[in-house]
């Protein structure tokens, strides 16, 4: 199709194979790559002067533009290296006590499950798992699945916005509203939703949201 041919022309791709994995690391369009390399050259040209006098202004400008794209306030957005670092910051920042419970799915990203296992070893956190069905009858079934896992000891619920191994898009807002009615904050893994789905973080009603720019945004 002419449209996709025009999109493909924006990228310089290896002709020896067809890449089918953009969710791990996506190519940058040539125009974006040129801007990226130009920025690196600019930082290298200015050296310490950039780090001491220009960096914060650049970072603040980027944060404001990202906040507009994400649908949140710039004061709510922190720039990290990736989704894993963002979610880890929240998980390890909780004041956990022995016996506290965290709820998550077997389908959550492995690095995040590992972080909760670390919390279990370090603080005695009890991890409770749900199994998201491949073909749920409705969104209500998924919401109820998480609702059944919450107890009076639940301190945090983690959910994927888009399950990376199945492509299932969860009813995030409905899950968040259910959890909040029970006094449970919600952490959302949005690594594969950001720039792929049309939404505003503020409309999801979540407490924490982590995403990456090197995946579907092609940044």
Name the predicted role of every residue range.
Residues 1-219:
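Pyridoxal 5′-phosphate
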């Amino acid at each position: 199709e002419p449209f996709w041919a025009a999109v493909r022309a924006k990228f310089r791709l290896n002709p020896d194979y067809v890449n089918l994995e953009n969710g791990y690391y996506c190519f940058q369009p040539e125009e974006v790559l040129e801007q990226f390399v130009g920025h690196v050259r600019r930082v290298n040209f200015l050296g310490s002067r950039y780090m001491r006098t220009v960096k914060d202004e650049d970072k603040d400008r980027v944060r404001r533009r990202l906040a507009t794209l994400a649908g949140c306030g710039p004061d709510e957005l922190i720039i990290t290296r990736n989704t894993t670092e963002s979610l880890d910051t929240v998980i390890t920042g909780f004041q956990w006590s022995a016996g506290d419970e965290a709820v998550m799915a077997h389908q959550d990203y492995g690095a995040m499950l590992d972080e909760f296992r670390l919390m279990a070893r370090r603080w005695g956190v009890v991890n409770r798992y749900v199994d998201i069905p491949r073909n749920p009858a409705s969104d209500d079934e998924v919401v109820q699945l998480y609702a059944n896992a919450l107890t009076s000891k639940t301190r945090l619920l983690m959910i994927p916005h888009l399950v990376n191994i199945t492509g299932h898009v969860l009813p995030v807002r409905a899950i968040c509203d259910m959890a909040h009615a029970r006094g449970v904050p919600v952490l959302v893994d949005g690594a594969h939703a950001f720039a792929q789905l049309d939404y505003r973080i503020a409309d999801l009603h979540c407490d924490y949201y982590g995403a990456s720019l090197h995946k579907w945004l092609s940044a």
